[in-house]
Each structure stands twice: as structure tokens, then as C-alpha cells.
Amino acid sequence: MPWLQVRLAITPEQAETYEDALLEVGAVSVTFMDAEDQPIFEPDLGTTPLWSRTHLLALFEADTDETALLAHLALLTGGDLPEHHVEEIADQDWERSWMDNFQPMRFGRRLWIVPSWHAAPEPDAVNLLLDPGLAFGTGTHPTTALCLEWLDGQELAGRQVLDFGCGSGILAIAALLLGAERAVGTDIDPQALEASRDNASRNGIEPARFPVYLPADLPQRQADVLVANILAGPLVSLAPQLTGLVRPGGLLALSGILAEQAEEVRAAYSAHFDLDPTAEREGWIRISGRRRAD
């Protein structure tokens, strides 16, 4: 079934008004999109930031009267409509389209991330089966890729791993499949913990080998390896805590860092870690190193 799509160019201040009005006039969905390819970095917790210029996309049933719709929308919002465009678009199987675009990916020498519905390209490789049904890491983002490649290059046999900000659990599960004895995950989002549990089960990992916690419940034990793919601000503010969670001689890998933020993050850890050269991909950075003996 085709749909009538209305696209409006709005400011953040107009967002709530137009979202409410579009739903009032019968939109079956309303979506916010970046109008100018502007990234949003490190929003405050509990906020839903928007770009300075945002496109608001609304879908209506195809037989909707376009003229009446726009007139009603103008009436509800109390003035002339902002720049807008109306067109008919074909229906499509969005889930199938997304699944077709998420293909197996290789990281380093041994590790593959394989969608759970896809056959493993190399059955004898280390294959991590992933179903990113919740909006967490899949390996496609440069920061996740940098961490996965780093893990693939480490000797993890018998190691205890901490995944700080675990999301889908992709980094901890990769470490376990690459030989780690046990991993612990922590995240501020309960949905992330559920996604981690589901993905661990899909890969045959028992809960005892990969317990996950909210930060307040995280046992304060030192790990042999700590990975944290979060953001530069938290990495800097949490540096004393993260340092304390790595045993002397243990390894650290940090990502979620923009190139211009690298020096600040390195400075926050350089007092206690011998840091490796910075790794970079598409403007994102990985910082890794070994904790010095106390």
C-alpha cells in the first residue's frame, strides 16, 4: 500500500507543536531526521536533543486529502506552515530491507560478527551471532569496530573482562568467544542489559560467564581487561573509577572518542597507564594501554 508523506523543515522549538498537530490530523507515524548532517555529541542524560534544522516526516494513508490536511495543520499550529514537501511513496518491507543491509563483518584475523539469520561465511572462524533488535551496537560503527579489532589482537585466554557500557554485549561476548574465561557487563540502560543477556544466550554463553549489572550494582572487582565504548566526557569523569577497575598489568581499551577529544582522554589515563599509539577510523579514536604497577 502506498503512503502520503509530508516533510516539514522545522526548528527544535517547533518540534513538539508540529508533532502533536500531525498526530492530531491523522498521521500514522512521525519521525525526526537531521536536515543538515549535523552530529549530536554527548547529550545530557534525560534529554532528547534535536538538530538546529530538523526534518519532520509524517506518513498518512494514501487517500488523505492533501489540501485539507495542510489547511488543518496550519490552523492547529496557528500560522503559515514552514517549508514543506508532500509526495506519495511506495510501501516496502522495512524490516526485510534493513536485514538485507546488515551483512556479516570481519574484524581482525579471527572474529566475524554474523546476523543471527545469516549463515556464517567461515564456519571455522570465531563467529559471534548478533540480533540487534534493540538499538545497540552491531559492529557497523567505527568505535565498535575499533574495539572488536583490538580484542581480536589480544591474548584473552583465561582473562577476566569488564565491558563498561555494554549495550548489546557485543564486546564482552566477542572477548568470551576469543577465549576469555569470564566477562562482566554494565550499562545504565536496563534494555541494554536485556539485549546483552539475549545475545549471550544466542551464542551459547551461560549467564554465570557473563553477568550484567546496572552501575550501582556492579561488583568492585578488578579485571584483567576493561573495554569502554561510551563517550569522551564520561571517560574523562570516570577515569579514577575505571582505572581502579583494572588490575596492575591489566589492559584498557577506550572508544567513543572524537579525534579532537583524544588528548583530553589520554591525559586522564596517562598517570596510571602506558598508552599505545592512538588508533583512528573515520574521525573516531581508540585509546588503549597497560596499567602500570602501583
UniProtKB/Swiss-Prot annotation:
The keyword Methyltransferase applies. GO terms for biological process: methylation. SUPFAM superfamilies: S-adenosyl-L-methionine-dependent methyltransferases (SSF53335). Its EC number is 2.1.1.-. Keywords: Cytoplasm, Methyltransferase, S-adenosyl-L-methionine, Transferase. One of its GO terms (molecular function) is protein-lysine N-methyltransferase activity. It is found in: Cytoplasm. One of its GO terms (cellular component) is cytosol. S-adenosyl-L-methionine binds at T144, G165, D187, N229. InterPro entries: Ribosomal_L11_MeTrfase_PrmA, Ribosomal_PrmA_MeTrfase, SAM-dependent_MTases_sf. It catalyses: L-lysyl-[protein] + 3 S-adenosyl-L-methionine = N(6),N(6),N(6)-trimethyl-L-lysyl-[protein] + 3 S-adenosyl-L-homocysteine + 3 H(+). Belongs to the methyltransferase superfamily. PrmA family. HAMAP family: Methyltr_PrmA. Methylates ribosomal protein L11. This is Ribosomal protein L11 methyltransferase.
